[in-house]
């Protein structure tokens, strides 16, 4: 299956797209250069004759969309009548229209692009050719009204002076176009906005050879027919990469994805963005948003200022420059792009606010302008409820596997399909991969539960069963099979760190913490033998587990000059030293300065020691130089800061009831007299938000620190953002959290 997909990705060209009967019929009407009584493209007429559907219509065989069927059918009938061919086809088509044209109703949001312009013109041509089509029906009068309103809004001077989306529907404005002037907007490929029908119409009025060469090329490539748009090479490539990533199977195709993004970047403009094809001179916010997000995620240099091209002075956004409308899917992709913001990316903040407000007000019955996806509204709901920096990747993939439609259709002048974006191959691999990884994760949980029982941690009165929750957190982020040892180590270490923290909370005193610190520095369990049974159980488990981890790490770090046992001891000692400071503050009821608190608390939160010990299992060789780079990295500092502040906000009420007085909230309130608790939390949330922007930039910008290690730090920050939204979901999982764990770790993808 993977090899089959690689072969598919290796064949990407100008875009694989389903044929359009409507556009093919326009091309079929073109007279031959050598004999005007014959068609230039007789093969397209054969295609029309052989692709009429059983009910007499033309259009998508597997999806009945009334506007698509009626428009395509009228277009095909006009083409056949032009050459006085296919009388049986014409009779069947006329019968279909008589039975179905009345189904056209008032626009419910499902009109095709430019339908109100092109359909009424098409009907007039059908009437002139003597086709028997009913035209005196209420729906057509309504459509005629739509057409008149649209024409009143279109300044014809602008149509002839700057490129607009009207070029895509020129065949609907034939009586209003100056054909000589309009030729200034012909694309370098000879098309008008990549539309075969619009280009065919222009050719029949101008006989411009560039148009004909474009159409010849499309008919040849698509085999006797044409699609509604061509080429769509950038659009197809971007949506393929996005689909692979959302389904969680992109790791199998990294070389192919790099080739795709290199191709896209070649046509990227920081000033204008991109359109659906490399020849598209009219850029759009949909392709630009997708391109920006994917290119930034993969380390390419792109500027968010590109979105100025799609923003009004009132901070509103639109799909095409100089126009005033947009659909939901394009703003949805703008919203997704806005979440990969770096520091000072102010326009992305504006984009996020605008998109979030618009998407939050969508009705479930909304019909998108550009696509008819299986579960589009559910996709929007999920994204709004799960921001990128707090959504665990495997939870995201499980959701998208459910929402993905292998048979989804897309909307332009007609409906169309993208078989390289929506297909059974992608979804089948995604399900197979998800379930295979899930099976490995379940096996790891059993290993961890046996380890847990052997250490007798379950006997501790203060420590609940956190094994599954702890494992779920890392397994939902670093989920690949090759990170199995990392997940086991990370989970064990996280549980040990949490045990030490709980031990300090329930039984700790500065004196006891000093004993534990000395035992860690000496690596001697006998130094805690005089302490309580709970302390001895904890230290014994810590001692045995760290020794096992050192052995495992030494096996995978054979060339490292680092003394791994001493390194892990050092990290543990730093953690306990920081917890000792916490204990002393608590004993004295001392509230330090905000800066002093954070200096210690970003260590006592336990992420620095966890990460600096876990990195041995990231598949990279860790030298002393690299270790020092990681220790000093802004990436590590920001991860610890986010973890601490998220933890403080989530556990504040519980810790206060327990008697703890020093937290980032209380320290900030003490320094800023008169502010409320909620104001302090709002300030801390602001720090978290800005830290995320900086961390995102650190993570996505190439550096000496390997990507897998930066990813582990980034995912750890993401875990804390997820675990501690407003409460402690680690010690006391909510029902939603428990349900998510069940869904990701135990329910297979079906």
From Swiss-Prot:
<feature type="binding site">
    <location>
        <position position="505"/>
    </location>
    <ligand>
        <name>Mg(2+) 1</name>
    </ligand>
</feature>
<comment type="similarity">
    <text>Belongs to the terpene synthase family.</text>
</comment>
<feature type="binding site">
    <location>
        <position position="501"/>
    </location>
    <ligand>
        <name>Mg(2+) 2</name>
    </ligand>
</feature>
<comment type="function">
    <text>Bifunctional diterpene synthase that directly generates the endocyclic double bond, as well as the hydroxyl group: produces an endocyclic double bond isomer of copalyl diphosphate (CPP), and carries out subsequent replacement of the diphosphate by a hydroxyl group to form (13E)-labda-7,13-dien-15-ol.</text>
</comment>
<dbReference type="GO" id="GO:0010333">
    <property type="term" value="F:terpene synthase activity"/>
</dbReference>
<feature type="binding site">
    <location>
        <position position="651"/>
    </location>
    <ligand>
        <name>Mg(2+) 3</name>
    </ligand>
</feature>
<dbReference type="InterPro" id="IPR005630">
    <property type="entry name" value="Terpene_synthase_metal-bd"/>
</dbReference>
<dbReference type="InterPro" id="IPR008949">
    <property type="entry name" value="Isoprenoid_synthase_dom_sf"/>
</dbReference>
<dbReference type="InterPro" id="IPR008930">
    <property type="entry name" value="Terpenoid_cyclase/PrenylTrfase"/>
</dbReference>
<feature type="short sequence motif" description="DDXXD motif">
    <location>
        <begin position="501"/>
        <end position="505"/>
    </location>
</feature>
<comment type="pathway">
    <text>Secondary metabolite biosynthesis; terpenoid biosynthesis.</text>
</comment>
<feature type="short sequence motif" description="DXDD motif">
    <location>
        <begin position="284"/>
        <end position="287"/>
    </location>
</feature>
<dbReference type="InterPro" id="IPR050148">
    <property type="entry name" value="Terpene_synthase-like"/>
</dbReference>
<dbReference type="GO" id="GO:0102305">
    <property type="term" value="F:(13E)-labda-7,13-dien-15-ol synthase activity"/>
</dbReference>
<feature type="binding site">
    <location>
        <position position="655"/>
    </location>
    <ligand>
        <name>Mg(2+) 3</name>
    </ligand>
</feature>
<dbReference type="InterPro" id="IPR001906">
    <property type="entry name" value="Terpene_synth_N"/>
</dbReference>
<dbReference type="InterPro" id="IPR036965">
    <property type="entry name" value="Terpene_synth_N_sf"/>
</dbReference>
<protein>
    <recommendedName>
        <fullName>(13E)-labda-7,13-dien-15-ol synthase</fullName>
        <ecNumber>3.1.7.10</ecNumber>
    </recommendedName>
</protein>
<keyword id="KW-0378">Hydrolase</keyword>
<feature type="binding site">
    <location>
        <position position="284"/>
    </location>
    <ligand>
        <name>Mg(2+) 4</name>
    </ligand>
</feature>
<keyword id="KW-0460">Magnesium</keyword>
<dbReference type="GO" id="GO:0000287">
    <property type="term" value="F:magnesium ion binding"/>
</dbReference>
<dbReference type="GO" id="GO:0016102">
    <property type="term" value="P:diterpenoid biosynthetic process"/>
</dbReference>
<feature type="binding site">
    <location>
        <position position="501"/>
    </location>
    <ligand>
        <name>Mg(2+) 1</name>
    </ligand>
</feature>
<feature type="binding site">
    <location>
        <position position="505"/>
    </location>
    <ligand>
        <name>Mg(2+) 2</name>
    </ligand>
</feature>
<keyword id="KW-0479">Metal-binding</keyword>
<feature type="binding site">
    <location>
        <position position="647"/>
    </location>
    <ligand>
        <name>Mg(2+) 3</name>
    </ligand>
</feature>
<dbReference type="InterPro" id="IPR034741">
    <property type="entry name" value="Terpene_cyclase-like_1_C"/>
</dbReference>
<dbReference type="InterPro" id="IPR044814">
    <property type="entry name" value="Terpene_cyclase_plant_C1"/>
</dbReference>
<dbReference type="Pfam" id="PF01397">
    <property type="entry name" value="Terpene_synth"/>
</dbReference>
<dbReference type="Pfam" id="PF03936">
    <property type="entry name" value="Terpene_synth_C"/>
</dbReference>
<feature type="binding site">
    <location>
        <position position="286"/>
    </location>
    <ligand>
        <name>Mg(2+) 4</name>
    </ligand>
</feature>
